[in-house]
């Protein structure tokens, strides 16, 4: 961007440099001397004010010029409106017309509305509101936000300033090429074709979710899973009566809420598994609430009906209490009794799923570029970044250029749920896609774009936007934030780095761990990613005083050596709950100990003896409990505590004793207290630490 020096502009305007500098300072454009430079916008503004002025007498010309430069920015803007609208005519007509324009603007401004983007500079806000930027800067500084005229502020702060000036504020919705791509155009009814339902199986841990899926798809993964609990989200296709059903398997424990939520966003039908012997459990209630919130139809599979302790009617009663009344009881909830182990009722369950799918009238357009959702992503040896994708509309084909979040790629290969290579995948089909530039995030929307070059450009732009948003948020500094950060010096932090084999595990661990935070200890996951533990992870942990948690991954050799050198703690796990329990234990070490008072006993002072060199000793009778030699005590007189301290000596007759039980007499010497009187009550107690 070219810049103009003050003396060059003065020469062009036929003014002296001194006069121009004076007038620029009046406009809050700070220049030091004739060699100072001006931005193009500033030059344009000044030229706009002085160019094409009607030729008049020197006196009138000078007066007009002075008036212009004495106006504030609002007047300048009004002058520009006036000049643009009324360039011709006599000076008298111009003045009259200007008044008319200003009156009209004033009437329109009674309800002033401005549109503000997510971020804008102080200068841009001033231009929108037609006020002096200096005034805005003053108001922001008063709120503790230090900014310059070209520094960006966020929508929230900009809106507050605008409201102070009487403006109604709307947020600008900027639609770039990315958002336009994400906005799916509605399909014509004639292009839509029936598609298979996508079914998610949910339920309480150990209620037989995986076993039910095994029975449905005739596979056996239960024994391969660590701890008998599904660790990763899988997808499979089942065919019945020449119709297909797609099953998603979301883990059923509370720790995997994030993974479950992701599964339900693309789900058409939910099968809720409830054990006939256990009934409704906490995770069952959680799953029901999630399904209700997602407004997805639900079928209840009452599993383990082959067990002697099975009680399906009790399950139905408990479900009814939660608003899921079975059809046979006059409600709308389909309940199917099944036994995954004995293969009972499986066909009936599948028929019910197809029936509900038919009622839902599930359709999609296969004859268009594909759109879908990443349900799982990982880095696989020999394959590189691999993602499981559910195609939701259109058809995904080999060679398609794809975009998912900030990751781009080209479909090099596709595998179906049986591991077979396929060339295309239609609506509802789950496929494993190879060809991504990096590991995408689970939950990202996948879209097909015209070519790989375009996909790369869009992915890079998304990355830039993310960095820009992060940078802008970092630039927001207020006195309030600064004060709270100083105050938080007393809050202890436990920093954690998570590395796992799949993205879903990273998310689940992150949420579970961060939920353990409390008022005294804040747990902060500073990094989470897929892949082995590297030297970079160890260096980050060393710099941040963090613990590294590896889930189903191992540290590289160099990383292990570096961790020993840097004294970085690496914990490796194969079951998620063990990781959470260990973190809880680590937290206890950071918590300030809490104590509670435990009363040991009460003794009444019945005589006071003066012992030379020792002081007063209380002759006492133990009313309740026991008095210990090392216990804390308080002396109570007429219901008022007169002293708190410790026992200096405890004797029975002339012997020192460790404790005196209820009903016995003893002599108690109190540390640094001689004002003991007959009738005083001595309460003995000790402080016990409360387990955290």
UniProtKB/Swiss-Prot annotation:
Region G4, annotated ranges: 303-306
Domain tr-type G: 194-363
Segments of this protein annotated with the region G1: 203-210
Subcellular localization: Cytoplasm
Binding site for GTP: 203-210, 249-253, 303-306
Presence of the UniProt keyword Heme in the record: no
Keywords, sorted A to Z: Cytoplasm, GTP-binding, Initiation factor, Nucleotide-binding, Protein biosynthesis
GO molecular function annotation: GTP binding; GTPase activity; translation initiation factor activity
Main localization (coarse): cytoplasm
PROSITE patterns: G_TR_2, IF2
Positions of region (G3): 249-252
UniProt GO cellular component terms: cytosol
Region (G2) residue spans: 228-232
UniProt-annotated stretches for the region G5: 339-341
UniProt similarity note: Belongs to the TRAFAC class translation factor GTPase superfamily. Classic translation factor GTPase family. IF-2 subfamily.
NCBIfam families: IF-2, small_GTP
Function: One of the essential components for the initiation of protein synthesis. Protects formylmethionyl-tRNA from spontaneous hydrolysis and promotes its binding to the 30S ribosomal subunits. Also involved in the hydrolysis of GTP during the formation of the 70S ribosomal complex.
Family matches, as PANTHER family: TR-TYPE G DOMAIN-CONTAINING PROTEIN, TRANSLATION INITIATION FACTOR IF-2-RELATED
Identification of the protein by name: Translation initiation factor IF-2
Species this chain originates from: Thermoanaerobacter sp. (strain X514)
